[in-house]
Amino acid sequence: MIKQFGMAWLITRRELTDQMRDWRVLAPMVVLTAFFPYLMTVAAQTAINYINQYGGTALIGTRVLPFLILVVGFFPVTVSLVVALEAFVGEKERGTIEPLLTSPLADWQLYLGKLMAGTIVPLTVSYVGISLYMFGLWRQHIPWPAFDFIAQTLALTAVQTVLMVSAAIVISTQSTTVRAANLLASFIVIPIALLIQGESALMFWGTNQILWLAVFGVAVISLLIVRLGLVHFKRENLLGREIDVLNLSWVWQTFWKSFSGSDASPLLLRHFISVWRRRNDPAQIDPAELSLGQAFVFDLSAIFTWYRVEIPRTLRRMSTAILITLAIGVLAIVSAYVYVDSQVVPGSLDPEKIQQAQQALGSSVIGIDHSPQTLFWHNIQAELGISALGIFSFGVLGIVVYIGNFALIGGLLATAKIVGISPLLYLLAGILPHGIFELPSIILVSSAILYTGVELVTPKEGRTIGEAMLFSLADLVKVFLGICVPLLVIAALVESLVTFPVFSYYLGQLIPVK
C-alpha cells in the first residue's frame, strides 16, 4: 500500500516542480502572502482603536481577530485555485496529457497525485500568511486570540482548502477547456465566501463548540467530494470528450424516465399539445387522438400504477437511508432532552420565569397564524431548504438541519418538564396530532437527501456524474411530490383543526392563549 501511494507521490512531485517554475503562479501567491497579512494587521489595529474610541469592550476586538485569520488564509487559496482547475484540462490543452495517461499508474493514483499537488501549495501559502499575520499582531502589541480560537481557524483553513481544491479537481476532470473550468470556479469561491461569513458570525458570538461542528461538517463534505472525484474519474473520458453540449432534451428524458418509470409523456399533456397544434393548423388531425376524458382516465390510472410500483421501489432502495435517518432523529430528541434537562436544577427558577417559559412553550405550538395554508407553506419552505442544502453538500447540511429540527422537539419536551408541564401531555396534545404526518414527511425527505449524497459517491459502472445526479434527483422529487407533500397537506389541516383546539383545551389554564 505504501508503494502504491509512493507512485501517486511521483505525480505530486512532478506537479510541484512545474508549479515552482511558473512565475505566473508564484508571483500572485508571493504578493498576497506578503501584503495581505500586513493589511489585515492594520485592519485589526484600526478596528480595535475605533472600538476603544467609543468605549467598546475589548471582547469585540478579540472576536474580530479570528475572523481576520480566516480571511488571510482564504485569499491565497483562491489565487492558487487556478493550479487545481488546470490539473487535467490544462494538460489536455497543452498536449501533455497523453504521456501521463499512458503511464502504468492506476486512475486513483493519477487523481490522488494531482489532488495532493493542488492542496500542498495553497495550504502552505495560507499558513505562511497566517503566521505573518500573527507576527504582525505581536509586533503591534495586539493580544492574540485564545488558543482554541486559533486552533479552530487553522483547522477551518485546512478543511476549506481541501474542499476548494477537491472541487476544483472535479471541475477540471469534467471540463473540456481551461476557460470553462475558470468560469465554473465561481461555484467554488462564492459558496466558501458565504461559509466564511457564517463562521465569522459564530466566532463573533463566541460559540466555540459549534465551530468545531463546522470543522467536522466541512471535513465530511471535503471527503465526500474527494470520493466523488475518485469514483467518477476515468482517464479514457479525458481524451474521449472534446466538446461540451448541453442537451436539455436528453436531460429531461433521463429525468422523466427515472421519475415516472416510463418513456411516455402524460396523455393529458399530449392532448393539449395536439389541440394547440390543431388551432394553428386545422389540417393536423390525428384520428388516434384521445378525448380529454379518456386522457384524464388513462393518466389517473398511470398515477395509481406509479404509486403502486415506483414509490415502493424507491422506498426499498432508500430503506437503509430511512433507518439511519430515523435513528439519527431519535438520538437527536433524546440527546436534546437529556442536555436541556441537566442544565436546570429543580426549584432554581422563580415563578415569574416559569410563567414566561410556559407562555413561550404555548406559543411554540399554537403560534400566531395557525391557518392551514400558512402552516403548509411554512413546512414546504423548511423541507425545500433542507433539500437545497443537502443537494449542494452531499446530504451533510440537510442532515444537520434535520438534526436541529428533531433536537428542538427534545428541547421543548425537557423545557415543559422543567416548568411543571407534563412532557407526555405536551407531546400528545401539542406535537403528535399533526406530528404523525409531519415527522414522517421530514424523515423521508431527509432520507432522500442522504440517499442522494451516497448515490453520488458510490461507483456505478457506466454512469457519469450527470447521470448519477439526475437519477438521484428524480428519486428525491419522487418522494417529495408523491409522499411528503400529501403528508404536509394533511399535517397542516390537522395542526390547524385539531392540535390548536386540543392544546388550548388541555393547557389553557397554564398557558394563556392570546
Question: Predicted segment positions?
Answer:
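Interfacial/capping segments of alpha-helical transmembrane domains
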Residues: 44-53, 333-361, 502-509
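Terminal transmembrane helical anchor/hairpin motif
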Residues: 46-51, 144-148, 175-246
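Transmembrane helix boundary and interhelical loop/hinge segments in multi-pass membrane proteins
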Residues: 80-101
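Aromatic- and glycine-rich beta-strand/loop motifs that create alpha-glucan
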Residues: 1-32, 242-246, 250-320
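Hydrophobic alpha-helical transmembrane segments of multi-pass membrane transport/permease proteins
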Residues: 19-47, 67-80, 124, 188-199, ...
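A structural motif at transmembrane helix-loop-helix junctions in multipass membrane proteins
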Residues: 20, 24-27, 87, 142-190, ...
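Selective transmembrane-helix segments that form parts of the transport pathway or gating/packing helices
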Residues: 75, 80, 105-135, 326, ...
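Membrane-interfacial helix-loop-helix connectors in multipass membrane proteins
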Residues: 47-64, 131-158, 206, 414-429, ...
